[in-house]
Amino acid sequence: GGTSAGAGLVLALIQSLAAESISLPCAIYTGTPWVDLTQAGDSRHVNEGADRVLVTYEGLLQSAAALYAGTIDLSHPSVSPIYGDFTSFPPVFIVAGTRDLFLSDAVRLHRKIRDFNGTSQLEIVEGLSHAEYLIAHETPESYMTYDELRAFFLQHL
């Protein structure tokens, strides 16, 4: 699994493996996933300034997206896996906070997996910004997230 851009990389990798008929993991974890570099999604605007970690998409994140994509269109699944194929995808655990700039990515990812008849568990944590369950790892919200993640993997592995 992975968090933020790492979650996007993991999902793009799984899509590539599936396209090549290479065996897939039994389950994966995505934390506050950045899966759409096109800036689609309501939370990019609503949580602007409310996310205490990322704060804004303008500047650093926008530059990182352009640098990562290079000449590839930002909506291509290799850089924005939300636009890819989720057929035969392993079960996915998704976590995000209500103040996360990428909350919409998490919600849309969950829906996309379900649209492909896949298994997805979405955990939204009240009041948390981007990846705060990892940053402030000794909080009740973090412990709750880790407990949910543990239960998910015990169920699917």
Task: Tell me what each language-model feature is.
Residues 1-157:
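Alpha/beta-hydrolase superfamily serine-hydrolase fold, recognizing
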